[in-house]
Amino acid sequence: MKIVTFCIYITICFLIIGCKKSTSTIRDNAYDSVEKYETELEKLCLESHNDSVTYSIRIKTEDLTNDYEYKYLGSLKIKKNNFKVIQQKILSGQYQDSQRAAVSIRLFLKGKLYGEFTGLNNFYKIKITSNSLCLYNYETKSRSIYELKDSIPNLLFFPYNDKDSLSSGDIFYFNRP
């Protein structure tokens, strides 16, 4: 009876120690692998060429939840270059209903990040057609079309409405890595 009790005790200790070690290893490596998973999702999105699929991953920590979403938008022909375009949306917050969105339009040339337009939020619907970038704002119910034939501008100004005498709207910045 003493041998059976001793074996059960050793087994339980082994399981507890084994679980603690694997959990701590996962947590230590979690911060290193977030960027790796983001890069893999970007690659999948670029290779899919399917604008009806959204690739996403949710990462939870003790006090924060981050949702990363990638959607293929299409390709832009600017001069002789053919840019692949994806939308990156990062929802971040302590709770699901209090998350804030950071949306960017990312341009890739020959599989490498060329640059991105930042400053967008969750109120924008983005559409790509040949050499045009079309933005629609759900909140203001306004739309703008940007023709990108010759070059990529450093700033895009999105007016809230055309009838307003004051220039009110959003500015999106183009950042290069």
Placement of each model-derived feature along the sequence:
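Positively charged n-region of N-terminal signal peptides that target proteins for export
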Residues: 1-6
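C-terminal motif of bacterial Sec signal peptides marking the signal peptidase cleavage site
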Residues: 15-18
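Acidic, small-residue rich beta-repeat scaffolds with periodic aromatic anchors
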Residues: 20-56, 127-177
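Surface-exposed acidic loop/strand-edge motifs in secreted or periplasmic proteins
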Residues: 41-122
